[in-house]
Amino acid sequence: MAESMAGLKRSCRCAEVTEANVGQEMTLMGWVQKSRNKGGIIFTDLRDRSGIIQIIFEESDCGAESFAKAEKLRSEFTVAVVGTIEKRSGAANPNLKTGTIEMRAKSLRILSESEVPPFPIEENSKTKEDLRLKYRYLDLRRPDLQRNIMIRSRVATMVRQFLADEGFLEIETPTLIKSTPEGARDYLVPSRVHPGEFYALPQSPQLLKQLLMCSGMDRYFQLARCYRDEDLRADRQPEFTQIDMELSFVDVEDVLEVNERLLKKLFKEICNFDVQTPILRMTWREAMDRFGSDKPDMRFGMELKNVSDVVKDCEFVVFKSALENGGSVRGINADGQAGMPRKKIDALVEYAKGFGAKGLAYLAIHEDGSYKCSFGKFMKQEELDALVKAMDGKPGDLLFFAADKDKVVFDVLGNLRLEIARQLDLLKKDDFKFLWVTEFPLLEYSEEEGRYVAMHHPFTMPMEEDLPLIDTDPGAVRAKAYDIVLNGTELGGGSVRIHQDDIQEKMFEVLDFTKERAREQFGFLLDAFKYGVPPHAGLAYGLDRVVMLMVGADSIRDVIAFPKVKDASCLMMEAPAPVDPKQLEDLDIAIVEKKDEE
């Protein structure tokens, strides 16, 4: 029978009790972690978000009624205990903040009983994630998840305080906006008042924050809720939180400088890690050439090397045909891995095929200087020697090579170096390597659409020196865009925005936007630009990703209170779900079942 807590007031949280409280009578409330009856003495671990304290029940101290209730305690009962804080009678528990003290109970109230939970409420649970997400309210009682959520809260508070001190205004932007379908799919919200018309949930506050700069707000930020209807993976959710900011009368350097100071503060206070500033910078081109990725993991080397010139005259058909078709031959050096078993090498070859490789050539350098090579019979000894030299190979090394179009080679080797690093345990979660990647291509060509599309968005400023190329070689135009990367994860990105009419018109033209289409989608922004727009730039971080890396989690699901799973559903609330037909009728919406194609 649940009891009332009337007349009781909690003194503090369980693990906030210290040796300074010894001798004091206190009232603690929380959940029973476990309870053990040792014959006349009951030891109960009481838990809340701060941690655990041990409670001692003896009938001589708490009376027959409270002792009888203590005998009934089970995991996850919610209780209130009044008692005196004492030094531990037995050995201290070094695993608890309260390991040197305990509470001797005087009275007990059972505020709420609990059924047997579907899984143990414990640190580092081995329970399947789907079951934990179905009972997320129980999962969130686990200490590791509670720590993650508390750190997330601290990060959000610190971001707000830092940006406010820097002169930023926190301004909320609408979440019911106009659909401007560029990039990911929008989540659409039907309007009852305007039948047949729809709002979109924002993929980001991009246009609205630019309008705030037009409004003279100078510096804006918010922790913005964003929505993207896209396929999920470990670092994606259909709804997520963005640390969003925009600044007026600035250029690239101003944005990078203020954000370096923000990152330095966050990682020092949360992780006790000193971010070295200025943060290393690398152009997009250099990142691709050296690491095969625009978000390279800098915690280890194993850089790509272009050996096209070294093998251009060889007769190995794989290398030869790739070069004849305008591709390249590149390699990575797995230092000291010449003894890797053939089974592991074969597994890496199959892994590479998953990223478009037709195969993977390899060469092991034995300690005596001889080679074990998958393509040795197709190349002369001096060609192999030159290849090894170009790769800085030495006895004990294992070299891998990919030959194809640059895009495929980068994808294959960029991912292969990460997989090898994972297998060699080179990726230390507490080693934070930051990087700014700059000078992204402004545009990329979409074979599917048969036109150039914006790599970031249509309002990104080209680099001034590349403007003459926009008509003759659009793919070569670089953007004033930048991403902040940490340990191979893109934390966020931003750019300087276009504020000149002629450049914006040219951008729409290159993107194959007619004036009519541009006005239909972005007329409100183009109108605002007629009335004096300041040069402006901004950046947005994924808050979820930042916290994920800070706490060493494997997925952003571990730092979000109520996340979705890979099909964008919520297992706990069973959303999405059908709605009452009357609701659809009010919205003038009819559900049409898709017929299977014959």
Over which residues does each language-model region extend?
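Class II aminoacyl-tRNA synthetase catalytic cores and aaRS-like
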Residues: M1-E598
